[in-house]
């Protein structure tokens, strides 16, 4: 297979959904077969490619059409201030993208904020989802054991409010378990993404005031999710508490949970090979 690059897979389209009128969405696309849409997290400078460049190739080789979507207000997608909880608005953006591309049904893979987006989508559009793969998703309210917000979320908001290379480095150090994976290339790439779109950072903070994290909680509606669900978590996640994985397991009818040891908040990146194998096996099962 020809090596996939960000530029060779980069595309744009416009969607029209509530809160996103004539809105430009950026995405990366490759492969053929059943559609898998991968949804990134909510840290400053995040985007589809930076979140999933270690996953897109193996999924394409496994026979899937893969779409890495930049959520509204992130990376190359249009800027936006949201009056409603972000997971719900992001779910509408996923629906809008699917409508524009003529996709009736898709599997969703979501990390952190992307997981919250996937949960909202599964609740609001149950006939449009295939299977659901979640990695440390947000949107699940308080923890049974840990005071909220966790350390990583505090550093995330600090970086939004005071963008600097040092604050970025502090957040990434909490993000990953294996500190040897933190390279200047990783930090510089994320820092450049932050600097390219300062408007995204300001709008995120304004949106967080209008619809704070407490409004994201969809726990009461998890029982509505009928999609087969594969939940993964990093044992050492310092952004979203591990007991939220149990909350999902208890409330979603057809769910299973895998916990990665020596893993932070970015399972699909930090343990890419194992994650890819487990996730693809899950999608292939009847």
From Swiss-Prot:
InterPro entries: AB_hydrolase_1, AB_hydrolase_fold, AB_hydrolase_sf, Epox_hydrolase-like, HOPD_hydrolase_BphD. This is 2-hydroxy-6-oxo-6-phenylhexa-2,4-dienoate hydrolase. GO terms for biological process: acylglycerol catabolic process; biphenyl catabolic process. It catalyses: 2,6-dioxo-6-phenylhexa-3-enoate + H2O = 2-oxopent-4-enoate + benzoate + H(+). Pathway: Xenobiotic degradation; biphenyl degradation; 2-hydroxy-2,4-pentadienoate and benzoate from biphenyl: step 4/4. Homodimer. Belongs to the AB hydrolase superfamily. BphD family. PANTHER family: MONOACYLGLYCEROL LIPASE, MONOACYLGLYCEROL LIPASE ABHD6. The lineage of its organism: Bacteria, Pseudomonadati, Pseudomonadota, Gammaproteobacteria, Pseudomonadales. GO terms for molecular function: 2,6-dioxo-6-phenylhexa-3-enoate hydrolase activity; 2-hydroxy-6-oxonona-2,4-dienedioate hydrolase activity; monoacylglycerol lipase activity. The record marks 112 as: Transition state stabilizer. It comes from Pseudomonas putida.
């Amino acid at each position: 297979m020809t090596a996939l690059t960000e530029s060779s897979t980069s595309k744009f389209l416009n969607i029209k959904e509530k809160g996103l009128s004539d809105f430009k969405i950026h995405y990366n696309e490759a492969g053929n077969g059943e559609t898998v849409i991968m949804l990134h997290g909510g840290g400053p400078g995040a985007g589809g490619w930076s979140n999933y460049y270690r996953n897109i190739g193996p999924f394409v080789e496994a026979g899937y059409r893969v779409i890495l979507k930049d959520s509204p207000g992130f990376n190359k997608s249009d800027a936006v201030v949201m009056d409603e909880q972000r997971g719900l608005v992001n779910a509408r953006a996923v629906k809008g993208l699917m409508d524009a591309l003529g996709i009736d049904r898709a599997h969703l893979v979501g990390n952190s904020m992307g997981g919250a987006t996937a949960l909202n989508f599964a609740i609001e559009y149950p006939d449009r989802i295939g299977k659901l793969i979640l990695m440390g998703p947000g949107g699940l309210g308080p923890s049974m054991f840990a005071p909220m917000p966790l350390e990583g979320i505090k550093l995330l908001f600090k970086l939004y409010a005071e963008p600097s290379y040092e604050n970025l480095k502090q957040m990434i150090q909490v993000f990953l378990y294996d500190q040897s994976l933190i390279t200047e290339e990783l930090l510089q790439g994320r820092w450049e993404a932050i600097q390219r779109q300062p408007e995204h950072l300001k709008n995120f903070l304004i949106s967080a005031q209008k619809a704070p994290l407490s409004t994201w909680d969809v726990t009461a509606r998890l029982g509505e999710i009928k999609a087969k669900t594969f939940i993964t978590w990093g044992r050492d996640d310092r952004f979203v508490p591990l007991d939220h994985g149990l909350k999902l397991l208890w409330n979603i009818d057809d769910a299973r949970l895998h916990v990665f040891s020596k893993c932070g908040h970015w399972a699909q990146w930090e343990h890419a090979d194992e994650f890819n194998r487990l996730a693809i096996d899950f999608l292939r099962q009847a």
